[in-house]
């Protein structure tokens, strides 16, 4: 890591072509500057650190070997793109992942060097297949490069794409497997074992590089001799590599493994790949967090994603006097573990996100009752249906945005068979800095049309614990959704009605205005009701923790009201709004288009999902209704 905060070489780069004039010494210094810049910048804003530290040399070699944007580079997963952004002239990392700042993923809005905002894993090879096919048809002979890493090869889409790529090899497609042995944490499964066999064989890389060095010391004759026999050397050494067999059976040429932190070796490999001019796999071995000791010492995930940290230690930068708050994810993980201790039928399923979804403690206590299936959401859900068939109660812990990928399996494998599978949808609603692709706003629209499913949205830690205990005893499909971040303060009910409907504010005798608050929106709605009361307008706030299907008590309450207000943190979808027509309904939901990045509070305020905005809108609409009577 550089000791001086001087980035002269980095700051001189405005396009990838600027790299062409750099000397080897300057390139070495540039790698140092880039790595230090990433550490210092991401420490201030948070972001994907470990992954990007591992692709510094790879990104520079790619841009020196190919001609972006004419040769298009597609990253999978897209969070590996920070160095790519720097090389393509985007140096303003002060507002990385903040409102109006640089995206943490590739973005066409930022640069024509970015092809796809691919923050959902395993899609790049399908994109590369389509782009390369189109270029062949259109007579465009530029290269398409797919950089596939951070566990993306555990996703089925990659293999579907490889199946099609191998069937049509008349195109210039380079597939770079960035093999760091991890997704968030260590990559699991059979594919990972194939790749790990190569990574574990350090003698393989050493023999390849040593043989080249020996011949190079013989001068020009030695280098010519090596060029002539390197194929035989590679073939001999590849006999020790199971990875070569894995890819060669797909009838796609394989080159590697290559030391991903040796720029010279990378550029040589890419030169060979270009000469082949057909689909080829370049297997690159990298180290997540390379060059930054705190990342390498982080056994959990090599500082995959960080918040604001102290760059000298990699530790979270705590604010003086700040009290640590429980998170929704943490409360879920603790409660599931507690329930599993007494209910041996509870098992957990996750798609390469054991720690981010709160299952680490569960895995430590019950390693044989948790199943990490890799980045394979469709498989996770269908496998859970099989677990349920044998009498277990699987809890599928998944981010709301990734649930979209498995909708068919929810419908056809779980719901069609009435399987008692519980989906725990973390990061539901507005998530914040990861932007449009990570907001969990579509789950309500999708799941409300699934026959037989029950949907729950706890408002605080207590209702989350109670709800989790309830759904783990249900004999039907269920789903619980909660947002990202610190859990809300407990909001006790004033009174509980039948079917689990809680009254949070107001008198049940006054039904001029009934506010139906779903999940965490209960807090904003109670605040709105308090503000309305200050203006002499009385209202009742009810909170159905199980909000779908619609309860008769909810329908009975709203049928008598002069104004019905619905507040939920999701895109507008079928529900109460279909039951209440016309002026009597006022909805507070998330607009149905893609939402930008920014802090959760910033975005909720901009949308109008806060107590003050809700109160103003209710007051204006209620006055209209009164004046029209």
UniProtKB/Swiss-Prot annotation:
Keywords: Isoprene biosynthesis, Magnesium, Metal-binding, Thiamine biosynthesis, Thiamine pyrophosphate, Transferase. GO terms for molecular function: 1-deoxy-D-xylulose-5-phosphate synthase activity; magnesium ion binding; thiamine pyrophosphate binding. Mg(2+) binds at residues 150, 180. Pfam families: DXP_synthase_N, Transket_pyr, Transketolase_C. Pathway: Metabolic intermediate biosynthesis; 1-deoxy-D-xylulose 5-phosphate biosynthesis; 1-deoxy-D-xylulose 5-phosphate from D-glyceraldehyde 3-phosphate and pyruvate: step 1/1. It is an enzyme of class 2 (transferase). Its EC number is 2.2.1.7. GO terms for biological process: 1-deoxy-D-xylulose 5-phosphate biosynthetic process; isopentenyl diphosphate biosynthetic process, methylerythritol 4-phosphate pathway; terpenoid biosynthetic process; thiamine biosynthetic process. One of its GO terms (cellular component) is cytosol. InterPro entries: Dxylulose-5-P_synthase, THDP-binding, Transketo_C/PFOR_II, Transketolase-like_Pyr-bd, Transketolase_BS, Transketolase_C, Transketolase_CS. Its cofactor is Mg(2+); thiamine diphosphate. The keyword Ribosomal protein does not apply. It catalyses: D-glyceraldehyde 3-phosphate + pyruvate + H(+) = 1-deoxy-D-xylulose 5-phosphate + CO2. Thiamine diphosphate binds at residues 79, 119-121, 151-152, 180, 292, 377. Binds 1 Mg(2+) ion per subunit. Belongs to the transketolase family. DXPS subfamily. Catalyzes the acyloin condensation reaction between C atoms 2 and 3 of pyruvate and glyceraldehyde 3-phosphate to yield 1-deoxy-D-xylulose-5-phosphate (DXP). PANTHER family: 1-D-DEOXYXYLULOSE 5-PHOSPHATE SYNTHASE-RELATED, 1-DEOXY-D-XYLULOSE-5-PHOSPHATE SYNTHASE, CHLOROPLASTIC. Homodimer. This is 1-deoxy-D-xylulose-5-phosphate synthase. It comes from Tropheryma whipplei (strain Twist). The gene is dxs.
């Amino acid at each position: 890591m550089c000791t001086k905060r001087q980035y002269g070489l980095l700051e001189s780069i405005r396009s990838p072509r600027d790299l062409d004039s750099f000397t080897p010494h300057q390139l070495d210094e540039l790698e140092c500057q880039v790595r230090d810049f990433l550490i210092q910048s991401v420490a201030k804003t948070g972001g994907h650190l470990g992954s990007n530290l591992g692709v510094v040399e790879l990104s520079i070699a790619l841009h020196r070997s190919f001609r972006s944007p004419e040769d298009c580079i597609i990253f999978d997963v897209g969070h590996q793109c920070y160095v790519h952004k720097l090389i393509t002239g985007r140096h303003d990392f002060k507002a990385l992942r903040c409102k109006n700042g640089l995206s943490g993923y590739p973005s066409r809005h930022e640069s024509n060097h970015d092809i796809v905002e691919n923050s959902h894993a395993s899609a790049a090879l399908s994109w590369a297949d389509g782009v390369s096919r189109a270029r062949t048809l259109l007579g465009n002979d530029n290269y398409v490069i797919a950089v596939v890493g951070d566990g993306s090869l555990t996703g089925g889409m990659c293999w579907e794409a490889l199946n099609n790529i191998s069937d049509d090899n008349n195109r210039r497609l380079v597939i770079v497997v960035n093999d760091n042995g991890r997704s968030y944490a260590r990559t699991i499964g059979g594919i990972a074992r194939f790749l790990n066999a190569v990574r574990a064989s350090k003698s393989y890389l050493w023999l390849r590089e040593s043989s080249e060095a020996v011949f190079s010391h013989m001068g020009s004759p030695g280098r010519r001799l090596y060029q002539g026999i390197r194929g035989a050397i590679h073939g001999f050494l590849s006999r020790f590599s199971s990875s070569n067999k894995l890819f060669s059976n797909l009838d796609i040429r394989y080159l590697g493994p290559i030391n991903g932190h040796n720029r010279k070796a990378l550029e040589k490999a890419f030169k060979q790949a270009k000469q082949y001019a057909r689909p080829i796999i370049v297997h690159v071995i990298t180290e997540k967090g390379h060059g930054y000791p705190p990342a390498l010492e982080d056994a959990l995930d090599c500082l995959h994603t960080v918040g604001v940290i102290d760059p000298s230690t990699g530790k979270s930068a705590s604010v003086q006097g700040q009290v640590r708050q429980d998170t929704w994810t943490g409360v879920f993980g603790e409660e599931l573990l507690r329930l599993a201790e007494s209910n041996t039928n509870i098992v957990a399923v996750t798609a390469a996100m054991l720690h981010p979804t709160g299952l680490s403690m569960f895995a430590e206590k019950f390693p044989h009752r948790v199943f990490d299936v890799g980045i394979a959401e469709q498989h996770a859900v269908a496998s859970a249906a099989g677990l349920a068939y044998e009498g277990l109660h699987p809890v599928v812990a998944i981010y709301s945005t990734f649930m979209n990928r498995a909708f068919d399996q929810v419908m056809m494998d779980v719901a069609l068979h009435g399987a008692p599978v519980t989906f725990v949808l973390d990061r539901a609603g507005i998530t914040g800095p990861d932007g449009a692709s990570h907001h969990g706003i579509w789950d309500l629209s999708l799941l409300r049309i699934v026959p037989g499913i029950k949907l729950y949205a706890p408002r605080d830690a207590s209702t989350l614990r109670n709800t989790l205990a309830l759904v783990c005893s249900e004999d039907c499909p269920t789903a619980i959704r909660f947002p990202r971040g610190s859990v809300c303060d407990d909001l006790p009910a004033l009174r509980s009605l039948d079917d689990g409907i809680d009254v949070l504010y107001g008198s049940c005798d006054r039904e001029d205005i009934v506010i139906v608050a779903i999940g965490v929106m209960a807090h904003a709605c109670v605040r709105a009701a308090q503000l309305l009361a200050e203006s002499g307008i009385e209202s009742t706030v009810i909170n159905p923790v199980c909000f779908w299907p619609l309860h008769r008590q909810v329908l009975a309450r709203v049928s008598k009201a002069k104004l019905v207000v619905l507040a939920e943190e999701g895109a507008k979808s079928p529900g109460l709004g279909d039951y209440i027509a016309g002026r009597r309904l006022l909805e507070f939901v998330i607009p149905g288009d893609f939402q930008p990045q920014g802090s959760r509070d910033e975005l909720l305020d901009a949308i109008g999902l806060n107590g003050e905005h809700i109160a103003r809108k209710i007051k204006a609409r209620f006055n209209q209704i009164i004046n029209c009577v």
